[in-house]
Amino acid sequence: MRIVKTIFIPLVIVCIILCSCKSKEHKNEQLSTTIDSTLQVKATSILENKLSELNALSVQAIVMEVQTRHIKAMVELERKDSADYQPCENFSQAHESALIQPISILAALETGEVKLSDKVDTGEGIYQVHDRELKDHNWHRGGYGEISIKQGLASSSNIAIYKTMEKAFGNDAQAYFNLLDKMSYGKPDSITGITNLKPAHFITPKDSSWSNTAFAWYCIGYNQTITPIQTLTFYNAIANRGRMVQPQLYKDSTMVINPQIANQADIDSLRQALEYVVTDGLGQPAKSSKVQVAGKTGTVQLEDGSYIVEFCGYFPANAPQYSIIVSIHKEELPASGGLMAGDVFRQIAEYIFIHNKYFNSK
């Protein structure tokens, strides 16, 4: 397969990003970009190779510094024809995302009704939710049986996630959405330099389209649309001990979205669980021998039958400096957030870690 490897492509992407917000162009010209061109080029090369390997439709990767909220690399490539991948600028394009699963668990922890060590019975991998069957990915192999909530998250068990929601919220799904709103999930609504970014969209109990099965599918990634940059913003807040800040493409004053998204003890518990995802769960392809990683895999099937496979996380796990999201759009199976997006995350993370002294000097 022939891949577009023109050396100036990553720099073209940077220029597109920096010029996209016309309403504030006069101000932006006076500010310096946060993008690191060297990292942008390297990330583009890694994505090109992975797209070629997977024959995927598109891929997006965003790298952000945890404390400064500066976006250091922002790359998106898509297949324009049967052979070539070219840069695009669909950073405002939203889709369903299974990366909400740890956020659902955080909301459950906030109620005080559950702990990560609590057991849930996933049975043989099929759970009846009114007139629909909720399945785990290994249902045809007999499911996971009884596992802890922490193990359920690491295994991406849909049943474990939803049963945790049942225990924490009972029949009050609106209480769950109230907590998501309190935690600022789906923010920000706009970022200077990213055109047409819209608020994340959720189907809630207040909507006419709400059904008695909507909650079960929402808490695992469906019945919503959210962009990768909005998802990364939340994971970056987890890495930043609960402080959510506005991602920036220009070096400007810090804007705090939420000074504390959740109780510190619950955030600390979730951070331990996200480490476990990588050391013992489906996130192991993101595991690095060079730096400790924490994060979560995600795989959803869209209405057209295609798949979104993702990995979002941060490193070093014990003292996070960078957060990264990788989102890949595939036409067909196999589709694995860990094996596909997690591997890209690892490659980018290791490159940053090896050149850590260089990036810290920026």
Where are these regions (language model features)?
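Beta-lactam-recognizing serine transpeptidase/beta-lactamase-like catalytic domain environment
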Residues: Q30, I35-L39, V59-A94, L106-I328
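A helicase ATPase "motif cassette" and its flanking acidic/Ser/Thr-rich regulatory loops
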Residues: A43, G152, F345
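Short, conserved phosphate/pyrophosphate- and ester-handling motifs at nucleotide-, phospho-/glycolipid
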Residues: Q101
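A short acidic/glycine-rich loop-to-helix N-cap element
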Residues: K330-M340
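Extracytoplasmic/periplasmic proteins that interact with beta-lactams or build/remodel peptidoglycan
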Residues: M1-R2, I16, C21-Q60, K80-S82, ...
